[in-house]
Design a protein with these regions (language model features):
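Carbohydrate-active catalytic/glycan-binding domains of CAZyme proteins
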Residues: 1-233
Length: 233
């Protein structure tokens, strides 16, 4: 199953019996569109993230981002993230997508489960005031932040905000900074953040930054006692 964005206005899904294809479109239309209940006012219908829960044999889809108004308000709680349970066929949804009150959501959903806790992570937008703290956790613009919940369908509000997972690549001096896309994944009992930066491109072009991105991966540190997870590039 391959879930993808259709130019920011919907989520499609392809299926294949092999990762090398051939891939086919089983629906002939988008899985999520502006006509999907509770999705008509999502600014950007893109950046899908899917997680299969082996314990319950259930799948969940997270998506969305952006800000609806252009009046300078709504950056702190744009309410443009959505989560929904997938059908057993994984090409349908069960119920209405739920609104996520994700602090300063910009884009870039990732979802995983550690123990009995769900970890939703995302890229914050470019309008986070300096010194912003939620639940005692500091973060900045275009950081990868995360929230936790015991239920994949929430409620997801600022009460579930858990902190910064991965600081912006600019503040880490990896490159000149920019928005990011990532995934938090588990492999053989360890956790990793897969993300993009322009570090390799800068090295190859004599220090020049032309905004070419390459994929990188670093191991994350998971504290079992506190449930905190952090990563440095």
């Amino acid at each position: 199953f391959l879930y993808f964005a259709t130019t920011g206005s919907g989520i499609g899904v392809l299926t294949a019996d092999s990762p090398t294809g051939p891939w086919t479109d089983p629906l002939g239309k988008e899985l999520i569109s502006r006509s999907t209940p509770n999705c008509g006012n999502v600014a950007w219908l893109f950046d899908p993230a899917v997680y299969y829960d082996e314990e319950t044999d259930e799948d969940y889809l997270f998506f969305g981002g952006g800000k609806n108004s252009n009046d300078g308000t709504g950056y702190d709680n744009p309410k443009t993230g959505r989560c929904v349970k997938l059908g057993k066929d994984m090409i349908s949804i069960e119920g209405t997508p739920q609104t996520m009150e994700t602090p300063y959501l910009f884009e870039d959903s990732s979802i995983t489960k550690i123990g009995d806790t769900w970890y939703y992570s995302y890229c914050s937008n470019w309008n986070v005031p300096s010194g912003t703290s939620i639940n005692g956790q500091l973060f900045n613009s275009a950081d990868i932040c995360y929230m936790t919940s015991k239920n994949p369908l929430g409620p997801w509000t600022k009460d579930q905000f858990a902190g910064m997972l991965f600081a912006n690549t600019g503040s880490q001096k990896i490159d000149n900074g920019g928005n990011n896309h990532h995934s938090l994944v588990e492999f053989k009992g360890k956790y990793y953040v897969i993300y993009h930066s322009r570090q390799q491109e800068i090295r190859m072009n004599g220090g020049k930054d032309r905004n070419y991105r390459s994929t990188q991966i670093n191991e994350a540190v998971f504290d079992q006692a506190t449930g905190k997870i952090t990563c440095k590039g």
